[in-house]
Amino acid sequence: MNKWLEILKNNDYMGVKKYLKDGANLEETNDIGESVLACALRARCDMDLLMLLIESGADIFDFDEEGVSILDMAITYDNVDMVNYLIENGMDVNQTNRRSGFTSLMAAACYGRAKIVKILLENNVDQTAKDLKGFSAVDFARKMNKKSVLALLDYDENDPKNTSYAR
């Protein structure tokens, strides 16, 4: 995996192309089970390189040992183009593989990714989904004081339960 990480860190399209031609294994994972594609998202590789990986067989439906999906990684690293690509190619915006029940909308809310929240809402994401502790995306947005996200979600700042959160 070290060779992959080195190439991805440099966003080296030609290096990836050559490594793949030389027989590189796209199914390699890092210490925490992240795929090459997930590592490319973490390295903030451009869309051309990400598409090269996908067209070469990288699994867009992959997730790591904690259940963090490629969609989650795209949200974390604010890759709007990849979020759109994943949804257009069958990614279920309501599916989570995390044991905690943490969803893509919750991730977008935590990180204040308003543009991604809009995309998820346009694709019928469930705003009412709760994680194992009973928290929803609105709860995460309130906790993190993400006002731009709260403005997009079903949030009533005048509701008494919301008085100690963002206004």
Predicted regions and their residues:
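Intrinsically disordered, low-complexity regulatory segments in ankyrin-centric signaling systems
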Residues: 1-38, 42, 51, 55, ...
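Ankyrin repeat domain, specifically the short helix-to-loop turn at the C-terminus of the second helix
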Residues: 18-25, 51-59, 84-92, 118-126, ...
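Ankyrin-repeat boundary/"N-cap" motif
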Residues: 1-4, 29-37, 63-69, 96-103, ...
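Ankyrin repeat A-helix N-terminal signature
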Residues: 6-12, 39-46, 73-79, 107-113, ...
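Ankyrin-repeat-protein effector appendages
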Residues: 1-6, 123, 132-135, 139-167
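Alpha-helical adaptor scaffolds
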Residues: 41-42, 64-90, 94-99
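Ankyrin-repeat and related helical/solenoid repeat scaffolds used for protein-protein interactions
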Residues: 94-139
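Conserved ankyrin/ankyrin-like repeat signature
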Residues: 15, 48-49, 81-82, 115-116, ...
